[in-house]
C-alpha cells in the first residue's frame, strides 16, 4: 500500500509553504460516488489491526528551507528583491518597466505609465507579496491607493487603502474583484506594509477551449484568511460578466490604476506548485 499523501504543508509565521516536488498519483486510490455518498476504495475491505499497516515511509517528502521572516524560501523564484526591475516589463509594449525603484528596496507605481508584468509565465503558484498604501492620504473610495495583483494576468486580488474608506464590498481590499467579498478587512494602518500570501490554481480547458475545471484562490492578508479556496468564475472585469477565454500559463501583473495611487510593492516571490 503506497503513501497517499502528496503534499506537506509547513506553516510559518509569514505564510504557507507546500512541497514543490510532485508525487506520482496512486493508481489504486479512487473515490467513488454512490447515491451522492463518497466512498474511498482504498479504505474498503478488511480494516488494519496494527498501526504499522497505516504508516508510510515513501515517497520521501522534499525538504524546503524556509527563509527568515520576510525572506524567500529555498525553492522560491524571486521576482523582486529591491535591486532592479529586470524581471518585469511594461504590459503595454513589453519594454522595460517604468515604475520607480526606491532606496528602501521597494518599487512604486509610476502614475499613468501602465501596468507591469513578469517576463516569466506561471500556472499554479504560491505567491508572497508585500504592499503599502501611501501617506499622506488623498482621494476616496476606489481612487485611494488602488492597485491590483493579477494572477495569469487576468484574475485580480484587489489592493486598496480601505482604512476609513468605504466602497463596494466586492471591490474592497482583499476581494477577488467583483466576484468574492473578503471574509475580513485585515489591513494595517495606512503607510505600513501589508502582506499577501496567495495560493492560486489555474483553470483547465479542453481542446476546444471550453473550461472543464475552474481555477481557485486562497488569500491570507496579514496572517488573516480572507479568501478560502474560492472558485474563480472567470476574469475580473470592471464592467460586465466574467469571461473564460482559454489560456495556459501567464504573467503576474501589477496594476497602475491611473489615478496617482502611489502604491508600493516589495519582497515578491513565487513557488510553482
Residue ranges, per PLM feature:
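Bacterial Sec-dependent N-terminal signal peptides
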Residues: 1-27
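Carbohydrate-interacting regions of secretory-pathway proteins
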Residues: 19-273
Amino acid at each position: 500500500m503506497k503513501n497517499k499523501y502528496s503534499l506537506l504543508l509547513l506553516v510559518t509565521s509569514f505564510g504557507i509553504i507546500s512541497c514543490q516536488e510532485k508525487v506520482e498519483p496512486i493508481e489504486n486510490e479512487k473515490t467513488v460516488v454512490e447515491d451522492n455518498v463518497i466512498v474511498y476504495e482504498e479504505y474498503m475491505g478488511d480494516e488494519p489491526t496494527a498501526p504499522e499497516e497505516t504508516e508510510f515511509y515513501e515517497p520521501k517528502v522534499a525538504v524546503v528551507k524556509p527563509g527568515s521572516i520576510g525572506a524567500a524560501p529555498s525553492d522560491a523564484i524571486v521576482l523582486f528583491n529591491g535591486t532592479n526591475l529586470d524581471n518585469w516589463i511594461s504590459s503595454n509594449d513589453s519594454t522595460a518597466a517604468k515604475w520607480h525603484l526606491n532606496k528602501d528596496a521597494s518599487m512604486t507605481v509610476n502614475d499613468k505609465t501602465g501596468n507591469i508584468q513578469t517576463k516569466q509565465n506561471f500556472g499554479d503558484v504560491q505567491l508572497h507579496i508585500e504592499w503599502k498604501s501611501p501617506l499622506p492620504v488623498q482621494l476616496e473610495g476606489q481612487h485611494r491607493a488602488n492597485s491590483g495583483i493579477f494572477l495569469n494576468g487576468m484574475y485580480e486580488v484587489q489592493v486598496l487603502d480601505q482604512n476609513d474608506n468605504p466602497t463596494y464590498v466586492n471591490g474592497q481590499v482583499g476581494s477577488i474583484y467583483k466576484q468574492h467579498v473578503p471574509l475580513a478587512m485585515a489591513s494595517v494602518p495606512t503607510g505600513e506594509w501589508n502582506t499577501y500570501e496567495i495560493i492560486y490554481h489555474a483553470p483547465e480547458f479542453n481542446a476546444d477551449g471550453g473550461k472543464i475545471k475552474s481555477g481557485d484562490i486562497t488569500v491570507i492578508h496579514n496572517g488573516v484568511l480572507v479568501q478560502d479556496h474560492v472558485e474563480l468564475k472567470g476574469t475580473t472585469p470592471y464592467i460586465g460578466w466574467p469571461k473564460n477565454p482559454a489560456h495556459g500559463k501567464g504573467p503576474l501583473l501589477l496594476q497602475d490604476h491611473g489615478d496617482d495611487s502611489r502604491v508600493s510593492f516589495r519582497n515578491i516571490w513565487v513557488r510553482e506548485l
